[in-house]
UniProtKB/Swiss-Prot annotation:
Protein's organism: Thermosynechococcus vestitus (strain NIES-2133 / IAM M-273 / BP-1)
One matching Pfam family: YidD
Main location: membrane
Name of this protein: Putative membrane protein insertion efficiency factor
Compartment(s) where it occurs, according to its Swiss-Prot or TrEMBL record: Cell inner membrane
Keyword ATP-binding appears in the UniProt entry: no
Keyword Cell inner membrane appears in the UniProt entry: yes
Lineage: Bacteria, Bacillati, Cyanobacteriota, Cyanophyceae, Acaryochloridales
Any one annotated GO CC term: plasma membrane
Length: 90
């Protein structure tokens, strides 16, 4: 989780999880939830790559998404290569 920016982002997400998210019905179609995914991605890959992965995940989470198990990838996909799958197989 290295730097201060990563820690600050994770604290903000934890505040959201604790105080804001409970005010709404569960809407995330994936496991882990989008906020849990964001925390793990930022902790694993740092603020920039982790935020990039979290944004991609949030954009995939919509009413027409099939959903299901969608873990943080074990290797970070190249943001310049959008043809790479969202989560490469392990």
């Amino acid at each position: 989780m290295g730097n201060g920016l990563s820690k600050a982002l994770i604290v903000l997400i934890r505040i959201y999880q604790r105080w804001i998210s409970p005010l709404f019905l569960p809407t995330c179609r994936y496991t882990p939830s989008c906020s849990a995914y964001a925390v793990e991605a930022i902790a694993r890959y740092g603020a920039v790559k982790g935020t990039y992965l979290a944004i991609r995940r949030i954009l995939r989470c919509h009413p027409f998404a099939v959903g299901g198990y969608d873990p943080v990838p074990t290797t970070c996909p190249d943001p310049c290569n959008e043809s790479s799958p969202p989560n490469p197989p392990c």
